[in-house]
Amino acid sequence: MTRFMNSFAKQTLGYGNMATVEQESSAQAVDSHSNNTPKQAKGVLAEELKDALRFRDERVSIINAEPSSTLFVFWFVVSCYFPVITACLGPVANTISIACVVEKWRSLKNNSVVTNPRSNDTDVLMNQVKTVFDPPGIFAVNIISLVLGFTSNIILMLHFSKKLTYLKSQLINITGWTIAGGMLLVDVIVCSLNDMPSIYSKTIGFWFACISSGLYLVCTIILTIHFIGYKLGKYPPTFNLLPNERSIMAYTVLLSLWLIWGAGMFSGLLHITYGNALYFCTVSLLTVGLGDILPKSVGAKIMVLIFSLSGVVLMGLIVFMTRSIIQKSSGPIFFFHRVEKGRSKSWKHYMDSSKNLSEREAFDLMKCIRQTASRKQHWFSLSVTIAIFMAFWLLGALVFKFAENWSYFNCIYFCFLCLLTIGYGDYAPRTGAGRAFFVIWALGAVPLMGAILSTVGDLLFDISTSLDIKIGESFNNKVKSIVFNGRQRALSFMVNTGEIFEESDTADGDLEENTTSSQSSQISEFNDNNSEENDSGVTSPPASLQESFSSLSKASSPEGILPLEYVSSAEYALQDSGTCNLRNLQELLKAVKKLHRICLADKDYTLSFSDWSYIHKLHLRNITDIEEYTRGPEFWISPDTPLKFPLNEPHFAFMMLFKNIEELVGNLVEDEELYKVISKRKFLGEHRKTL
């Protein structure tokens, strides 16, 4: 990771030292391995590149693994996704655990008769089942498990809000959820073996206890794996989440409180048990509407409207934030991994072979790697989403088959309708096991359907955009010139050629370089610090103004009055420097204007090879030490290439050239100050001569 950070800190257009890494970075990386307590590396990307990245660089820089390796992806998923999963499961487990405490676990089989809610005109949807009081030990264990689970959730929320340190939080959470899940699991096993004779049936409370125990233990396993990653030195002691992403814990807790309040309220309004009321709240919140439990009274109907409207908004917010973390924030990082993996292989093959690549060939190869990575990313994301969806669909149907004693086809039919939130009502879970499982299954499966539709929509949009481009390229340029005219001339040119800088721009630049070179040769007669033309055909400006001022100070007389021959030489050099800077500034402003227009029109626009070459040439005009910023023909596939990152390319180029503009303006200000000094000394010299 140290080598990655060093290259990560200087990713610009090949201008090696535009971003520096502090000397302590490598030492800290070594210390992190030896002490098993990784510290965040201090390497900092160039500001221009950081602004153009499609992900936050600190999310990658804390992972102590090579970006091209599979372990990088694994530990990134552990550091980022696992806390999000825990934040979603923990509060839900607490919500369900309340039901397993409130509900009795056993009932007499003869009284477990469910009536059709449409056959009468009452609010009672289930005959009062004759439940059996649980042994005192079971109730006591349930209470202790609930308290431990609730405490663990509070601690996790404090850590998400950065009110508690990682080590303290992990110690309490892992211990608390392990004990809570273990006690509940033992309770369930003992009750099944010793306190469940044949005349009793398991109620919804018993099945909620089974689910709560499983969720507690899953949270324990997830946090334990995250803690192991920290102990192995793969990332620092923190959750790899941005500040706005940490708020997801607060929203999931709020949703759990909303479900707890709704279940308690509808239990009284509809005269049903707390567990069945929780099932009703889930059906209403997810807009499935199975119709097996209906509000009859006016008060119940009003509260359903209030509860459902606010609950749907809250659920939609959680789904949006979760998808944003998993796909939008982390998607560019997975793309970076795929590109870096392909680039590393190509770079290794290039270094091992004797084949020479031209700069254009290296650029085309890197573009091909990026396109392949993007295509694989889309299909992999779609495949994983569909696989998870199929698992929820088919495995969920399998559970309902045994819980409700339906045929497997009818279970598939029921699950698919629920995933689409259709809810005809011809099938609905009636048993305690079916309804308990439906609560946890629906809370995970129905929002997943929204993620699938969004993923498929993004993929279809990308495919349609690609087809539009191919169809557009088949048209003749004359047809395009009819569509794009007047003010759209620049955009028309970009659509026709795929380049934002015309040949005239490059020609003007070459002409300017030739003119500057000619003027520099003339000025060399007056000043030893003349400009030199480098191998790339770019003319460097004259010596720095600080050096000119220093030479003028040394040449002056003790009275501080310059001889006229020195004044003439410095004045000519200063005038040429100002002319050179103004012309370069004009070219930079022209390029920046085009790039700014592209940034506003299309953030996904990719620059062509000639565009990058022209931008590189513009940048080098303001570099004094040209040799320090020279690059080989293989630059585009080297570790220093900026194209290995998911970039907003026009914005990156815009920021690079804008920095040059700032430097040029600074040079012009220095020119003006130095010109005043020269004019003053020239006046004093002429005045002395007349005397």
From Swiss-Prot:
Extracellular domain ranges by topology: 93-137, 192-203, 267-301, 401-435
GO-annotated cellular components: cell periphery; monoatomic ion channel complex; plasma membrane
GO BP: intracellular potassium ion homeostasis; potassium ion transmembrane transport
Chain intervals with Acidic residues compositional bias: 504-513
Family indicated by similarity: Belongs to the two pore domain potassium channel (TC 1.A.1.8) family.
Function: Outwardly rectifying potassium channel.
Protein's name according to its UniProt entry: Outward-rectifier potassium channel TOK1
Gene: TOK1
